[in-house]
Amino acid sequence: RFIVANGLERYKTGKNLALTEYFFRPYSGNGHKPFTYDFDDTGGQADFTKQFVTKVMQTHSGQCRSLPMYYKVLAETLGAEAYIAYAPAHVFIRYRNEDKMYPEEWVNVELTTHQITPEFFYKEHFEISDKAIENKIYLTPLTDRETVAAQLADLAFGYWNKFKCYDEFTRCCTEKSLEYYPQHPKACIILGKSLDAALVKHLKENGYKEDACTRQIEAQSATLYEKLKALGWEDMSEELHDKLEKGNQE
């Protein structure tokens, strides 16, 4: 009804426009309560469930991961084209600028600030290298298969958050994630930590002796690290981390 009432059906991206309005502004359809960024426990350290899409649905507030994921869920329901995209420690929505409303090829929906954001902002604000963009680590719209694969890495991270260990489960999740989304840094990192845990476990069991198994695990870890470097991934500096945290607070 919102689409028809506002004449949005004449636009190719009318469903996206309606969804964006649904998130950004108060309407009867969202109970006059737009979706906002939850500044309390942004990383979910105190309560990991604050990262969940169900929390967004219940409270109309969430973080940079859960808000775009809910947008994606609703877009799929409406039959709208929308894609998950990553920046360092950040998630946002992209869709094609088919109606030429903006100067760029893609429309970037920043649900944390209620803005349509130009691409250069992400490059500058998150200090993303050209190499990382070329290798499709960041700013690349994910396919649905890649989006699901990324959730496997998130599942592995949630498992670690609950049980405080890396093991065969986190290893299986991330190996399968990388099978369908091979350049996903988060999956590479968690897999690397899972391999480290497997190495420690094996060394304890064999009396801390080097053998074929230890050499195999060490080789896998080295390959992962070299892969991350080749893709252009860089560990987030303290300065960038502090800048992003300050930006969240502001």
Which residues fall in each region the model found?
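Short coil/linker segments at helix-helix boundaries
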Residues: 97, 201-228
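Terminal, low-structured helical/coil segments at or just beyond the last alpha-helical repeat
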Residues: 215-250
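Amphipathic alpha-helical repeat scaffolds of TPR domains
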Residues: 134, 138-162, 183-205, 234-248
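Alpha-helical solenoid repeat scaffolds, predominantly canonical TPR units
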Residues: 172-173, 180, 190, 217-224
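Secondary-structure boundary elements
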Residues: 1-54
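Hydrophobic/aromatic-rich core segments of domains that either
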Residues: 66-134
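Helix-turn-helix repeat elements of alpha-solenoid scaffolds
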Residues: 125-133, 160-174
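Active-site neighborhood of thiol-dependent amide/isopeptide-bond enzymes
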Residues: 34-91
